[in-house]
Structure formats: structure tokens, C-alpha cells
Amino acid sequence: MLFMMAAIALAVLLFMYVAVALRDHHPFLNRVQALLRDFDNTLLYGTHVRIYDLSTPARTERLFIIAPENVVLYNFDKTLYYYLDSANVFCPNEYTVAKFTGATIRTVNDTGVYSTACTVVGSLTLIEHFVGLKNNSPDHTLVLDVAEQIQFTIMDVINYLIYNGYVDIAAG
């Protein structure tokens, strides 16, 4: 009987050793880890921001295209313009932009009212201008993972860009 129990204990120990060895030294472990690493680096469910920079030492001029939503932000001379989709509602025959400066951000925080303006320059015109000058090659591309970096709204992305210094806004 003692011999039988020792044999069972030895068999269990041998089985556990084989299970641990297979887990740590599985023949496909490298490939599985590479697949998981590649999956983590894809843009599934995340967002990316393409930054086109035409700035000079005298002034800032940057275009941000936030994909997959295709939101356009334009940073010119310490003001950030957010092109709204509801262009014809506020400005007939023109495009509506929300303006962000230091003063308007304080107003939004205090009252919840955004500063909007009308412009004849559309977001498509800006995209064609920047993409044409940069040969469709952005200066920077930021990849934001929704689960780990940001609870995704456009305002969160704008705050992220301001906080990390990609947007130049007047302190005003």
C-alpha cells in the first residue's frame, strides 16, 4: 500500500513538472508572445493623431487630424481651432470653429459656454494645404490606447494635446 501511494505521489509530481515545463518552454511560446505583442501595437479601438507642423520661430502653425473620427484641429498663433461638424447650423455658407485660448478655456470651465467663430476656410482646405506641403507625411503620429491612456472624447484628446505641449495656447 505504501508503495502504491509513493507511486501515485511520484506520478503527480512528474505530471506537475511536465505541465510547468510545457508552460514555460512551449515550442510555440515565442510565436504566441510575438502575436500578442503585435496585437497590442495595432490601432484596434484606439485612436491616433497625425500632426502636421509648419511652425516657424515667430509663430505656431500645426494641423491635428484625429482618426478614426476625422476631427480636425488647427493651432495657429497661440489659438486652437476645433472644426465642428455642424457647420451650417451656426454659420450659413461658412464653417463653424470652436476657439480655444487661455481666456476661453477659463470661460468654458466657469460657464460651460464655448467660444465659436465663423470662417470661410474649411477643414478640407486646411488638410489639402498641410498634406500637400508635407507630401502626406505627418511630422508626428501619436497613438492613444483608449483603455490605458484616455477615456476617449474629443475634449479629452484636446486636453491631452495641450497638457503634453503639442498645442501652443496663449496663457491669456
Swiss-Prot record:
A UniProt-annotated Pfam family: Baculo_19
Family: Belongs to the baculoviridae 19 kDa protein family.
Domain of life: Viruses
Protein name (Swiss-Prot/TrEMBL): Uncharacterized 19.4 kDa protein
InterPro entries listed in its UniProt record: AcMNPV_PIF-4
Gene source species: Orgyia pseudotsugata multicapsid polyhedrosis virus (OpMNPV)
